[in-house]
């Protein structure tokens, strides 16, 4: 398979420092809003990268569920591989690839668990099918056949046919406290624009990076 000639030019326009918000969360929200308005597929999908005890990196796609001045929030099974890795090393990075807009956002920071109240509030807002799936699946565990998972789901569906579904103790969220956010905008002739926001105490330093 020949891959060397697969390329394209970036022509959506550049990014200048004067166009950036002073706060990176404000800038991120602007870009996210534009990604949603452009009807991108899964605009809140992000790559979440963690490392295990041996320094081996792992990545997976997770949906962003909230972002504010306190950080970026996602939810997962607390018995999953990523949750175990974050228990060992809370350092984390997030990546949003908004290809149709020729944009990327890369975030580094530290993950911390959400409170039980925060978990309950979000879990109760999910569709019932998603709640059942969260309980049925022991994420990252080995299973011999899909039928086992489907059988457990149907069993739970019957069990909770009436009434509320309790928040499982092994399910919850993480908040990523941001250390840095990089905004990348594709440019002509591979002269891309990159701006890095780095947290310095209560302020943000902004640097342009070479592409």
Curated annotation (Swiss-Prot):
Record-linked PANTHER family: PYRIDOXINE-5'-PHOSPHATE OXIDASE, PYRIDOXINE-5-PHOSPHATE OXIDASE
Sorted UniProt keywords: Flavoprotein, FMN, Oxidoreductase, Pyridoxine biosynthesis
Positions bound to FMN: 60-65, 75-76, 81-82, 104, 139-140, 184, 194
Enzyme class: oxidoreductase
Subunit text: Homodimer.
Cofactor-binding details, from the entry: Binds 1 FMN per subunit.
InterPro entries with a match to the protein in the record: Pyridox_Oxase (IPR000659), Pyridox_Oxase_CS (IPR019740), Pyridox_Oxase_N (IPR011576), Pyridoxamine_oxidase_dimer_C (IPR019576), Split_barrel_FMN-bd (IPR012349)
Cofactor(s) listed: FMN
Summary of the function given for this chain in its UniProt record: Catalyzes the oxidation of either pyridoxine 5'-phosphate (PNP) or pyridoxamine 5'-phosphate (PMP) into pyridoxal 5'-phosphate (PLP).
The protein, known as: Pyridoxine/pyridoxamine 5'-phosphate oxidase
GO molecular function list: FMN binding; pyridoxamine phosphate oxidase activity
EC number: 1.4.3.5
Family to which this protein belongs: Belongs to the pyridoxamine 5'-phosphate oxidase family.
Catalysis performed (reactions): pyridoxamine 5'-phosphate + O2 + H2O = pyridoxal 5'-phosphate + H2O2 + NH4(+); pyridoxine 5'-phosphate + O2 = pyridoxal 5'-phosphate + H2O2
GO biological process: pyridoxine biosynthetic process
Pathway: Cofactor metabolism; pyridoxal 5'-phosphate salvage; pyridoxal 5'-phosphate from pyridoxamine 5'-phosphate: step 1/1; Cofactor metabolism; pyridoxal 5'-phosphate salvage; pyridoxal 5'-phosphate from pyridoxine 5'-phosphate: step 1/1
Record: residues binding substrate: 7-10, 65, 122, 126, 130, 190-192
Organism: Vibrio atlanticus (strain LGP32)
């Amino acid at each position: 398979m020949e891959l060397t000639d697969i390329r394209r030019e970036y022509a959506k326009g550049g990014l200048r420092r004067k166009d950036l918000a002073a706060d990176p969360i404000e800038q991120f929200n602007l870009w996210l809003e534009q990604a949603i308005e452009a009807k991108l597929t899964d605009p809140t999908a992000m790559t979440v990268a963690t490392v295990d005890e041996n320094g081996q990196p792992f990545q997976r796609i997770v949906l962003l569920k909230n972002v504010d001045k306190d950080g970026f929030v996602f939810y997962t099974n607390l018995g999953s591989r990523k949750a175990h890795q974050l228990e060992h090393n809370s350092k984390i990075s997030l990546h949003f690839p908004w290809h149709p807009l020729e944009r990327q956002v890369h975030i580094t920071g530290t993950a911390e668990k959400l409170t039980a109240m925060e978990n309950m509030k979000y879990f109760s807002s999910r569709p019932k099918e998603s709640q059942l799936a969260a309980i049925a699946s022991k994420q990252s565990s080995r299973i011999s056949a899909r039928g086992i998972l489907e059988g457990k789901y149907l069993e739970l569906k019957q069990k909770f046919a009436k009434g509320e579904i309790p928040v499982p103790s092994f399910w919850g969220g993480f908040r990523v406290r941001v250390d840095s956010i990089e905004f990348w905008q594709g440019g002509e002739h591979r002269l891309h624009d990159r701006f890095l926001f780095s947290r310095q105490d209560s302020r943000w330093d902004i640097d342009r990076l070479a592409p």
